[in-house]
C-alpha cells in the first residue's frame, strides 16, 4: 500500500451503514448535573467557570482542571458556520473504545450518514443555545458495534460570544 492509499484508508468514513442511530440529548445547564450524575465533576467545573456568562470561555479553564479525565476526553473546535466540529485531541481511553483516528477529522468525515441524520441538528442546537449534550448508544462504526458510548458534550466560547469549542467526555464506567 502506497502513502496515498494509506492516507485515503485512514480518512475514509468509519460508520457502519447498517447501524442504528445513537441517542442524542440536550440539557439546559441547570438540568444537566441532576440528569448526568456520572459527569457531575465536569459539569460543576463548567458551571463554576461560566462566571456571569451563559457558556464559559475556553481561556477560563486549564487542561489540568480535567486531570482525572484526561484519558476520557476529546477536544473539538467549530470552524465556520457549519456545526461540524473538528477533533483536535483524544485521550487514550476514548481512543481505545473508538479504535479509529479522530484527530483532524470532523464528525461528517467519520460518519456522514449520522451527521446528516442526527449530529448536524444536535450540534447546531448546542452551539446556538449553549446547551449541554449527551450522545449514547452502541458505537455505529464498522466492527465496533459492541462498544458502548456515553459521551458528554460541554460547549465553550473561544474569546468571543459564540460557542466555538466542545469538550467531549466518555463516561468512565463505559470506557
Positions of predicted regions on the chain:
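Sensory/regulatory domains in signal-transduction proteins
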Residues: 2-14, 22-175
Amino acid at each position: 500500500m502506497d502513502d496515498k492509499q494509506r492516507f485515503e484508508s485512514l480518512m475514509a468514513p468509519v460508520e457502519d451503514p447498517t447501524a442504528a442511530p445513537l441517542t442524542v440529548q440536550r440539557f439546559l445547564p441547570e438540568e444537566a448535573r441532576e440528569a448526568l450524575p456520572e459527569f457531575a465533576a465536569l459539569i460543576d467545573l463548567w458551571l463554576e467557570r461560566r462566571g456571569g456568562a451563559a457558556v464559559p470561555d475556553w481561556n477560563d479553564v486549564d487542561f489540568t482542571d480535567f486531570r482525572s479525565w484526561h484519558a476520557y476526553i476529546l477536544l473539538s473546535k467549530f470552524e465556520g458556520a457549519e456545526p461540524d466540529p473538528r477533533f483536535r485531541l483524544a485521550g487514550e481511553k476514548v481512543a481505545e473504545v473508538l479504535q479509529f483516528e479522530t484527530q483532524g477529522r470532523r464528525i461528517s468525515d467519520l460518519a456522514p450518514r449520522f451527521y446528516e441524520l442526527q449530529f448536524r441538528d444536535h450540534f447546531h442546537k448546542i452551539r446556538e443555545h449553549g446547551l449541554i449534550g449527551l450522545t449514547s448508544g452502541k458505537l455505529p462504526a464498522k466492527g465496533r458495534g459492541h462498544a458502548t458510548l456515553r459521551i458528554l458534550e460541554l460547549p465553550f466560547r473561544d474569546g468571543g460570544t459564540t460557542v466555538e469549542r466542545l469538550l467531549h467526555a466518555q463516561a468512565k464506567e463505559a470506557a
